Amino acid sequence: MERREDVIVGKHVYGSLYGVPREKATDEEYLRGVVVRAAESAGATVHAVNSWTIPGEKGGVSVIVLVLESHLALHTWPEYDYATFDIYTCGEHTDPWKAFELLLSELKPRKYTVHYVDRSQEKTVLEAQPRR
């Protein structure tokens, strides 16, 4: 196997937001804008945005932003004043913590939980050889 010196940088910030105001948690257009701005604040390149409102009394909003460096997602449960978020970015130039800070400043939860996982790979990556 041939060795190659590469660094694959992956940073994953995810968690829950409690006490999100209902008027924010139900506004699909507003939430789309928030997640796009969060992606941009992280230094990520927005590629595609999709969102939808789940109808009904227990409906909510989901927003997915596909970035060239990975993705951001936000899902709300307005009946519980609750939302979850997932911010995964690749590359040294991105900072998912900046996206998280923007979510906090925009959605203004009363409290939150946040987790971080370093999903980077070791510097030495073994390249697969073709089968014979």
Swiss-Prot record:
Cofactor: pyruvate
Cofactor note: Binds 1 pyruvoyl group covalently per subunit.
One example GO MF annotation: arginine decarboxylase activity
InterPro entries: AdoMetDC_fam_prok, ArgDC, S-AdoMet_deCO2ase_core, S-AdoMet_deCOase_pro-enz
Domain of life: Archaea
Signal peptide (from-to): none
Known EC number: 4.1.1.19
Modified residues (Pyruvic acid (Ser)): S70
Residues the record marks as active site: S70 (schiff-base intermediate with substrate), H75 (proton acceptor), C90 (proton donor)
Post-translational modification: Is synthesized initially as an inactive proenzyme. Formation of the active enzyme involves a self-maturation process in which the active site pyruvoyl group is generated from an internal serine residue via an autocatalytic post-translational modification. Two non-identical subunits are generated from the proenzyme in this reaction, and the pyruvate is formed at the N-terminus of the alpha chain, which is derived from the carboxyl end of the proenzyme.
A cellular component term, taken from the record's GO annotations: cytosol
GO biological process terms, semicolon-separated: arginine catabolic process; polyamine biosynthetic process
Annotated catalysed reactions: L-arginine + H(+) = agmatine + CO2
Pathway: Amine and polyamine biosynthesis; agmatine biosynthesis; agmatine from L-arginine: step 1/1
UniProt entry keywords in alphabetical sequence: Autocatalytic cleavage, Decarboxylase, Lyase, Polyamine biosynthesis, Pyruvate, Schiff base, Zymogen
Marked site (Cleavage (non-hydrolytic)) residue numbers: E69, S70
Described function: Specifically catalyzes the decarboxylation of L-arginine to agmatine. Has no S-adenosylmethionine decarboxylase (AdoMetDC) activity.
Subunit structure: Heterooctamer of four alpha and four beta chains arranged as a tetramer of alpha/beta heterodimers.
PANTHER family named among the record's database cross-references: S-ADENOSYLMETHIONINE DECARBOXYLASE PROENZYME
Family indicated by similarity: Belongs to the prokaryotic AdoMetDC family. Type 1 subfamily.
Name under which the protein is recorded: Arginine decarboxylase proenzyme
Taxonomic source organism: Aeropyrum pernix (strain ATCC 700893 / DSM 11879 / JCM 9820 / NBRC 100138 / K1)
